């Protein structure tokens, strides 16, 4: 049948099972929005306050559901406003499809009004991108974009469609979309045998879990693997929830703000089994001294991650779910009683701790955990509050911590929380932000209010850019350059002005009451938590130091006393 480009686009989205799109209209994309209007009962559109919010919402939707997130933007500044969100998704391997419309084909390359080369701009931050200049190519391009976004190592794909293409007609034949095969090559069984042999020989194995285990939906296989190996487990920020944070073998996060137990344990292990992690600098500390006593065995879907940041001894390339299932079939039951006992002693000796008297970031996280019974989707911005959330909320399920781990995007959380709630409406969704991050995209409070999306926005408000100030305090002679937010911004009044409910908390009791209110409010709520600007994230690894030199507040005080 003959359809115009806008009709073909909407039909192809329906083929892919798309039920929600986040975006912002404009002149170049008007044909698409006109067609979307006719299908509003099948595809709901969430009008964000800014295109960056739309890209983050698509990202949050994808992380929470495991499906592809979709965002729309018009040409020029509409398209460029998506860039930060696309880059965020790219760094964390999140499948989104960003659809932009450009000026008509005859106007391309002529500096036309709102013309921009968005495919050129996004080439380094997309898995693939397309500009469709012929309507006859549109349907196959959209189908290909969704396949690329989901297969192999996931990632964002951009499709740029000139306006005249959305109006031109072509033959459209609907197709039934087949399930995506994530990894099409067979796993090398010789590599599997080597992996099993290394595990059997190890006396002090340690499992390190990254976001790849979540992207592969491999939590069940991971738990079975750990049961077989019988060894301690740590994770990266992106791996939170892949392995239950309440399990006896779990030791916490690894790296710069990881637990001493994880950092010391990995440093003393003789085999580090890496499951879907990329060895970022935030994990390894000094890479030349990382896990220096251990052989390293890496499981990953992307061969490019092998020997990229850390030299490994053996690797198995493949979908994590399939790799673990195959290893589990071949691996005999292991036992490492003495090694586990030593790690448990570390856990008892080096617990996470914070000042118990006042309203602090860690208390806020623990109270959220208590009231949500560990069953919420937690979204964070970037900074101290992000680390506190990773440390003090015990994540037991995958896709329950949504955070910008690679790009470290301030302003990510509120849009992502909206996307997560639209994808998982049955879940409590909480976005935790610092006051600096909240300012970046707080206009999305109006979006949540417009659609009465019941997300809870917790602002951990210390009136400074906390993480940067912490570094200035420890490593820059307490010279607080541009990190003190001396102003009179009232987040409660701002939230109320945008149509949300809001409350301020200055004590523990006030926060507990405020969060209880937010859980039952039936709409968006902003909680402004006033905490001390001197609160810090502990433990910490100094820049350039090995993770075996992780220190906390007590260590720092003892060092200052001896000096």
Question: Model features per residue range: what roles?
Answer:
Residues 1-331, 367, 371-374, 454-457, ...:
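N-terminal alpha/beta PP-like core and its mobile active-site loop of ThDP/TPP-dependent enzymes
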Residues 6-10, 14-19, 27, 32-37, ...:
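Active-site diphosphate/adenylate-binding microenvironment
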Residues 10, 86, 142, 416-417, ...:
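Generic hydrophobic/aromatic pocket-lining and core-packing "Φ" positions
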Residues 24-26, 45-56, 71-78, 133-134, ...:
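Active-site nucleophile and cofactor-binding loops and adjacent substrate-binding regions
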Residues 114, 450-543:
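Thiamine diphosphate
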Residues 136, 293-384, 508-512, 517, ...:
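Phosphate/pyrophosphate-binding active-site segments
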Residues 296, 368, 380, 419, ...:
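Hydrophobic, well-ordered secondary-structure elements that form the walls
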Residues 412, 416-454, 460:
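Catalytic phosphate/nucleotide-handling subdomain of diverse soluble enzymes
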């Amino acid at each position: 049948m003959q359809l115009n480009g806008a009709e073909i686009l909407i039909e192809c989205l329906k083929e892919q099972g798309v039920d929600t799109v986040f975006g912002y209209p404009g002149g170049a994309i008007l044909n698409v929005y006109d067609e979307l209007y006719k299908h509003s009962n099948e595809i709901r559109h969430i009008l964000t306050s800014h295109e960056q919010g739309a890209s983050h919402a698509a990202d949050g939707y994808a992380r929470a559901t495991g499906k592809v997130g979709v965002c729309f933007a018009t040409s020029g500044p509409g398209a460029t406003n998506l860039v930060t969100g696309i880059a965020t998704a790219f760094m964390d391997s999140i499948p989104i499809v960003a659809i932009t419309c450009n000026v008509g084909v005859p106007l391309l390359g002529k500096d036309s009004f709102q013309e921009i080369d968005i495919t050129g701009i996004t080439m380094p931050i997309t898995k693939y991108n397309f500009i469709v200049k012929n309507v006859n190519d549109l349907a196959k391009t959209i189908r290909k974009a969704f396949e690329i976004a989901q297969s192999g190592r996931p990632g964002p794909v951009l499709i740029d469609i000139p306006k005249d293409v959305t109006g031109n007609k072509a033959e459209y034949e609907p197709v039934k979309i087949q399930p995506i095969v994530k990894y099409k090559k067979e796993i090398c069984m010789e590599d599997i045998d080597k992996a099993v042999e290394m595990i059997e020989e190890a006396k002090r194995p340690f499992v390190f879990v990254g976001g790849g285990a979540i992207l592969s939906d491999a939590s069940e296989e991971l738990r079975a693997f750990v049961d077989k190996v019988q060894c301690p487990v740590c994770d990266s920020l992106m791996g939170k929830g892949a392995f239950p944070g309440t399990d006896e073998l779990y030791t916490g996060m690894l790296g710069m703000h990881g637990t001493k137990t994880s950092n010391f344990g990995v440093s003393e292990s003789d085999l580090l089994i890496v499951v879907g992690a990329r060895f970022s600098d935030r994990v390894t500390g000094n890479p030349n001294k990382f896990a220096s006593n251990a052989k390293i065995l890496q499981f990953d879907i992307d061969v490019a991650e092998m020997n990229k940041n850390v030299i490994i001894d053996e690797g198995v390339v493949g979908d994590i779910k399939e790799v673990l299932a195959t290893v589990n079939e071949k691996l005999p039951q292991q036992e490492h009683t003495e090694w586990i006992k030593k790690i448990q002693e570390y856990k008892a000796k080096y617990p996470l701790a914070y000042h118990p008297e006042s309203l602090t970031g860690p208390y806020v996280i623990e109270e959220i955990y208590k009231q949500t019974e560990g069953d919420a989707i937690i979204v964070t911005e970037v900074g101290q509050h992000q680390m506190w959330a990773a440390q003090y909320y015990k994540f037991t399920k995958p896709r329950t911590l949504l955070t910008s781990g690679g790009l470290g995007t301030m302003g990510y959380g509120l849009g992502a929380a909206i996307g997560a709630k639209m994808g998982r409406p049955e879940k409590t969704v909480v976005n935790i932000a610092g006051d600096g991050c909240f300012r970046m995209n707080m206009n999305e409070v109006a979006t949540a209010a417009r659609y009465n999306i019941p997300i809870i926005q917790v602002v951990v408000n210390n009136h400074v850019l906390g993480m940067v100030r912490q570094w200035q305090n420890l490593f820059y002679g307490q010279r607080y350059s541009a990190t003190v937010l001396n102003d009179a911004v009232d987040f409660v009044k701002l939230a109320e002005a945008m149509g949300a409910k809001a409350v301020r908390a200055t004590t523990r009791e006030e926060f507990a009451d405020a969060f209880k209110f937010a859980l039952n409010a039936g709409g968006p709520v902003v909680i402004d938590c006033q905490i001390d600007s001197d609160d810090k994230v502990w433990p910490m690894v100094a820049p350039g130091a090995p993770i075996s030199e992780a220190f906390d507040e007590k260590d720092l005080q003892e060092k200052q006393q001896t000096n």
